[in-house]
Amino acid sequence: MGAKPRVGLFVTCLVDLFRPSVGFAAIKLIEESGCTVDVPMAQTCCGQPAYNSGDRADTRALAESTIEAFEGYDYVVAPSGSCAGMLKKHYPGLFKGEPVWEARAKAFSDKVHELVSFLVDVRGVARVAARHAGTFTYHDSCSGLRELGIQAQPRALLASMEGLKLVEMQEADVCCGFGGTFCVKYPDISNAIVEKKTGNIDASGAETLLAGDLGCLMNMAGKLKRQGSRVEARHVAEVLAGMTDQPPIGGERSR
């Protein structure tokens, strides 16, 4: 029997700082798919905020350190379509005209996968053992859907869970208004977008909102809370792993 594939988990800034439980859920799911998981301590930001702001020098520096930190692994997995999209789609272009670094970036990007896509498309996971009663709706993040083609995969795994009912909101594939630094630079536009999104979430009748990107979830959860909605928000990894003992995103920890 061959050695298990080695996965380097790219935790992401938001998961590290605001929702570590997503990282632990990701580790559980990856291990259950038959892999070993490490969390390289040298990792930092993927560089997307700098990249979207036009700061190629800092983005490149972050890319170099990330590539070096993960080169020894068979796969690089991130519980975020946004960060995975940055690592997979944009790193090679930072090194155009530099054959050595461009080749390293290409080899790195070929190993990068978003978490749920990795489970379904790479490891062939068709169902999970976790159970969870309730009604859920799913938001497709812009980067996950448009850069990586992630849409059917999370729904397939959620459909395999006993007790879980998935209902589709209207325009599930439309932006939530977060967009990283977009929500800071254009707050009025961002607010109008998320207001429409939360209206669709409430109208779905779901008790819980799921998504694969913590930035989107924090944005939508904040708006739902300000509107007085009873809908809770969770990262899809937590539900798939059966690790829902933490308060919902934006919720208060019990004392």
Where are these regions (language model features)?
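Iron-sulfur cluster-binding electron-transfer modules in prokaryotic oxidoreductases
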Residues: 1-255
